[in-house]
Amino acid sequence: MGLIGKDLIGLRDMPAERIKLILDTAVPMKEIIRRQIKKVPTLRGRTVVTVFYEASTRTRTSFELAAKYLSADTVTIAAAASSVSKGESLKDTARTIAAMGADAVVLRHPMAGAAELLARTVDAAVINAGDGAHEHPSQALLDLFTVREKKGRLEGLKVAIIGDIMHSRVARSDIWGFTRMGAEVRLAGPATLLPPGLEKMGARVCSSVEEALMDADVVIVLRIQLERQQQGLFPGLREYARLFGINRERLRLAAPGAVVMHPGPMNRGIEISPEVADGLQSAINEQVNNGVAVRMALLYLLTGGGCRK
């Protein structure tokens, strides 16, 4: 078992001390990335398997880079190209992974709870890279790391999360993570995309984007999934941009020097204007860079911290 437990399934039940350990461990990992030779032998002899049942560029590449910078061997299983497409179940895939002798498995799956199911089946450390609309813990951890790096703290900050909360696993993990670390989380978006029960998670649901943005220290903009328009969950892209899009004028409501983030990929001109995405307050590119450092920390703590049997 690693220094933060066997697996990373979500942030819902993760204590603040464990989150802090991950963020603190990511600091020296970022120093490694800044070196001319971005490689250390920390996880030499370890095998990390990535299994993605949904398309991903950023997350998969980030985990693969993290593993390679730590000298781990990586195996990528693209679900469409594997026996999954022939009807193989998740448990069958788990047995195959176990036979490979993997030390860690990074899983993305459209079904909520898939990572937890896999964790019960294999001895390897399982990292949830997104399971349905449930959680995406490594994204939230890199968001926390980025904000702490920019602001010097997390406790007492006002964090506004804007957009499609209902279908966003990032939003759920961010809510758990930021509230656990003492931040105030505000939510805003179309009423049809704000599910019930958000207050029970410790967040405040605002009646407008403007209310959520008022004096906010951090603004997290969520990608609007275009297929939701076809389902009638919001009126149209132009209308969404007018009512909920984060532009320069709306951003003035936030605190001076507010940090703007987006988990990607972005719909420029819809949920976020190009001026904001590319502006001085944007930390979107830093999120990508920090994502590798945080995932290096996770792989180290779960498989290379000297506590695995």
UniProtKB/Swiss-Prot annotation:
Pathways per UniProt: Pyrimidine metabolism; UMP biosynthesis via de novo pathway; (S)-dihydroorotate from bicarbonate: step 2/3
Source species: Pelotomaculum thermopropionicum (strain DSM 13744 / JCM 10971 / SI)
Protein family according to the UniProt entry: Belongs to the aspartate/ornithine carbamoyltransferase superfamily. ATCase family.
EC number: 2.1.3.2
Keywords: Pyrimidine biosynthesis, Transferase
Primary role: Catalyzes the condensation of carbamoyl phosphate and aspartate to form carbamoyl aspartate and inorganic phosphate, the committed step in the de novo pyrimidine nucleotide biosynthesis pathway.
GO cellular component, as recorded: cytosol
GO biological process: 'de novo' pyrimidine nucleobase biosynthetic process; 'de novo' UMP biosynthetic process; amino acid metabolic process
HAMAP family: Asp_carb_tr (MF_00001)
Residue positions binding L-aspartate: K86, R169, R223
Molecular function via GO: amino acid binding; aspartate carbamoyltransferase activity
Binding positions (carbamoyl phosphate): R58, T59, R108, H136, Q139, G264, P265
Record PANTHER family: ASPARTATE CARBAMOYLTRANSFERASE, ORNITHINE CARBAMOYLTRANSFERASE, MITOCHONDRIAL
Keyword Heme: no
UniProt name for this protein: Aspartate carbamoyltransferase catalytic subunit
NCBIfam families reported for this sequence: asp_carb_tr, PRK00856.1
InterPro entries for this protein: Asp/Orn_carbamoyltranf_P-bd, Asp/Orn_carbamoylTrfase, Asp/Orn_carbamoylTrfase_sf, Asp_carbamoyltransf, Asp_carbamoyltransf_Asp/Orn-bd
Catalytic activity as recorded in UniProt: carbamoyl phosphate + L-aspartate = N-carbamoyl-L-aspartate + phosphate + H(+)
Subunit structure: Heterododecamer (2C3:3R2) of six catalytic PyrB chains organized as two trimers (C3), and six regulatory PyrI chains organized as three dimers (R2).
